[in-house]
Every structure is written in structure tokens, then in C-alpha cells.
Amino acid sequence: MAAVVENVVKLLGEQYYKDAMEQCHNYNARLCAERSVRLPFLDSQTGVAQSNCYIWMEKRHRGPGLASGQLYSYPARRWRKKRRAHPPEDPRLSFPSIKPDTDQTLKKEGLISQDGSSLEALLRTDPLEKRGAPDPRVDDDSLGEFPVSNSRARKRIIEPDDFLDDLDDEDYEEDTPKRRGKGKSKSKGVSSARKKLDASILEDRDKPYACDICGKRYKNRPGLSYHYAHSHLAEEEGEDKEDSRPPTPVSQRSEEQKSKKGPDGLALPNNYCDFCLGDSKINKKTGQPEELVSCSDCGRSGHPSCLQFTPVMMAAVKTYRWQCIECKCCNLCGTSENDDQLLFCDDCDRGYHMYCLTPSMSEPPEGSWSCHLCLDLLKEKASIYQNQNSS
């Protein structure tokens, strides 16, 4: 060992070696001081809760070795019990005093023995006070080391089980555990029923639109319209082909929903514009006759000029089931969720989720945008190319 130290001293220098040893000593001293201050603590490496101890000694405690092979010896520290503080003078932690009239009645009934053990008789007759009565022998140090977080833990700490050792085990087991078990089972049943009720209320609040046929719920009306069109409409058409008899009505609301749809499955269009309140004969904004464009899901109508449609868009909306802005859903996934992520084509007014596109988009592009269908159909005449040429 000495040879190794001499080699290090020769290689690095004596002053460098002394500085390194001093820094190592300072680091160990700080580490030991920090450990002694933060005890008790939970060791993250071993998972053991370290408790305070007296294995840390100082230089002034060091003495010569007493046995052979000992370099140093340290004095043994005498163990001392922690001094307890006086119990708090809280009237709630004391036993209730027996009034004279109560004492007389208990003596008449023979509940109090002649030796004067009134406390035992009181605990025998009233098991409720047996639960709430405090235990004056509870160690105050244990209360300080384990802070009480709720009333149940506080009751568990001050429970007078030590005073009930002289009582019969049968009486003690009949009173407390069975009543507690019943209370727990009843509270569990009530809490589970309340949780189910709260969950159903939240579901009804989050998804107010329900299907009258199958009971499936949706967050908005476009989703319910899409469900009607793609689920029950196809079933109705298949039933009409197989059987000419009219189906039995499920409810009055379902009949109204079916009556609002035309023979082709589209919603019956309104005969007026939702923006200018004109009809196909006159546009109240321009004063000219103009054809109405109707939503295939809700039947709302509007003039193309009121909708700010371009001539290309006016021709494109006649080739597919056009949807208004409130009923618009993604043309790829077919859902209307995350409507803030919908991107509309400037040539056909179809909607697409930005994350459904290939490649996906994180932000909407600047200027005009054309979908893949319009790019294949219009090619160089698409709005996206017109915007690039104008810029």
C-alpha cells in the first residue's frame, strides 16, 4: 500500500496528493453530516427506513485500543428512554364522569359491583362509548412520530383496547367487529351505486345525442346523423327489398326521423336559405334567382353565393352527398370528432382530418388547399396550383 502511495505522490506531486486527500476528507465529512441531519430517512438504494443511531463519533471521543489488534476505542453510549411530554389537558380525551343519579340507577340494576368498578360497568352497558373513549396510556412520542391524517386513524390510536382486557372476549367480538363490517358493506354498496349513477350522468352529459333504434350515444348531431345514414339506413333498404311489409314503428321519434328522409336516403331539403331567408326564386342579398344547395344530413339549404362557393365548388357539391358546416365529417374516417382538426378542400368543400391525411399535417397550410380527389380530377386547374401561380 505504501508503495502505491509513493508512486502516486511521485507521479502527481506531493502538494496535489495532499489537496486530493483534503478534498476527499471534506466530502466525506459533508456526507456524514448530511446523513446525520436528515435521519431518519428512506434509503433509495436499499429501500430501508434508516433510524437515528449513535454510530457516528467525533475525534474527541477517540481513545486508545483496549484489546489486542484494536487501534482505537470509543466510549459506549448509555441508552436512555425518551422523556415523554405531559398529556394534553383536552376534555375530549378524558373519561366522562358518572353523575350521582346515574350511579344510583346502575347500583339498583346491579350493574355496578360492590368493589366500585364503575368504569367496567359503564363500558359493558354502552359499547358506543367504548369506541370513542381515549386511552391515556398512548405514548405521546408515537403520536408525534406518526402524524394522524384522518379521523379514522385518530380513533384507532386513542381506542381504549387496553382497558378492555378484563372483559369477556365474546362480548367484545359481538359489539365492535360485526357492526363495523355491516357499516363497511353498506357504505360500499352505496358508494358503488353512487359511482354508477355519476358515470351514467356524465355519459348523458358528454353524449346528449342518442339513437332511438339501438341506443348508441354521440357527442354531437353530425355523428348521430352519420350513424343513422350508414347503420340503420342500409338495414332499412335491405328490409324493404326482402319484405314489402312496413316495419313496426319502434317509437314516435323514430317515425319522425324516418319521415324526414327522402326516398334516396337523403334528408328532405328546406326550401329557404338559412343565411338570407330567400328561396330558389330570389336571393335577398343579390335580388337574383339562385339554386339552393342542401345538406344531405340535416336538410338545411343555402345559396352558393351566401356560402361563398366558387364556380368549381358549385359544380363539385352536386356530385356527392354535401354536408353543411355543422354536419361536416371527415371524408376518410367518417367521424366528426376533433372538428378543430378538420381541413376543407377549396375545390369540393370536403372535410379531412389533418392527421388522417397522407402525409399527415400538424398545422393547416397557408392559402388554398386541394384534396387528392380534386388534384386527380382538376390537375393544373386545382386551387392549390392557382394560388401558387398567382403568388
UniProtKB/Swiss-Prot annotation:
Cross-link (Glycyl lysine isopeptide (Lys-Gly) (interchain with G-Cter in SUMO2)): K10, K99, K107, K108, K178, K196, K281
Biased composition (Basic and acidic residues): 100-110, 126-140, 253-263
N-acetylalanine modification, residue list: A2
Gene3D superfamilies: Classic Zinc Finger (3.30.160.60), Zinc/RING finger domain, C3HC4 (zinc finger) (3.30.40.10)
Biased composition (Acidic residues): 165-174
Keyword tags: Acetylation, Apoptosis, Chromatin regulator, Cytoplasm, Isopeptide bond, Metal-binding, Nucleus, Phosphoprotein, Repeat, Transcription, Transcription regulation, Ubl conjugation, Zinc, Zinc-finger
Pfam families noted in UniProt: DPF1-3_N, PHD
Intrachain disulfide bonds: none
GO biological process: apoptotic process; chromatin remodeling; negative regulation of myeloid progenitor cell differentiation; positive regulation of double-strand break repair; positive regulation of stem cell population maintenance; regulation of G0 to G1 transition; regulation of G1/S transition of mitotic cell cycle; regulation of mitotic metaphase/anaphase transition
Subcellular location(s) of the protein: Nucleus; Cytoplasm
Record InterPro entries: DPF1-3_N, Znf_C2H2_sf, Znf_C2H2_type, Znf_FYVE_PHD, Znf_PHD, Znf_PHD-finger, Znf_RING/FYVE/PHD
Tissue: In embryo, highest levels are seen in brain, eyes, thymus and olfactory epithelium in nose, whereas several other tissues, including the musculoskeletal system, show moderate expression. In adult, higher expression in testis, medium in thymus and spleen, lower in certain parts of the brain as the hippocampus. No expression in adult heart, lung, liver, duodenum and kidney.
Zinc finger regions, PHD-type: 270-330, 327-377
Residues with PTM Phosphoserine: S142, S200, S244, S280
Record GO terms (molecular function): histone H3K14ac reader activity; histone H4K16ac reader activity; zinc ion binding
GO CC terms in record: centrosome; chromatin; cytoplasm; cytosol; nucleoplasm; nucleus; SWI/SNF complex
Positions of region (Disordered): 79-147, 165-199, 233-266
PTM-bearing positions, type Phosphotyrosine: Y172
Modified residue annotations for Phosphothreonine: T176
ZnF bounds (C2H2-type): 209-232
Purpose of the protein: Plays an active role in transcriptional regulation by binding modified histones H3 and H4. Is a negative regulator of myeloid differentiation of hematopoietic progenitor cells. Might also have a role in the development and maturation of lymphoid cells. Involved in the regulation of non-canonical NF-kappa-B pathway.
Quaternary structure (record): Interacts with the nucleosomes, in particular nucleosomes bearing histone H3 crotonylated at 'Lys-14' (H3K14cr) for which DPF2 has high affinity. Also interacts (via PHD-type zinc finger domains) with histone H3 butyrylated at 'Lys-14' (H3K14bu), histone H3 propionylated at 'Lys-14' (H3K14pr), and histone H3 acetylated at 'Lys-14' (H3K14ac). Interacts with histone H3 acetylated at 'Lys-9' (H3K9ac), histone H3 di-methylated at 'Lys-9' (H3K9me2), and histone H3 tri-methylated at 'Lys-9' (H3K9me3). Interacts with histone H4 acetylated at 'Lys-12' (H4K12ac).
Protein family membership: Belongs to the requiem/DPF family.
Name listed for the protein in its UniProt record: Zinc finger protein ubi-d4
Species annotation: Mus musculus
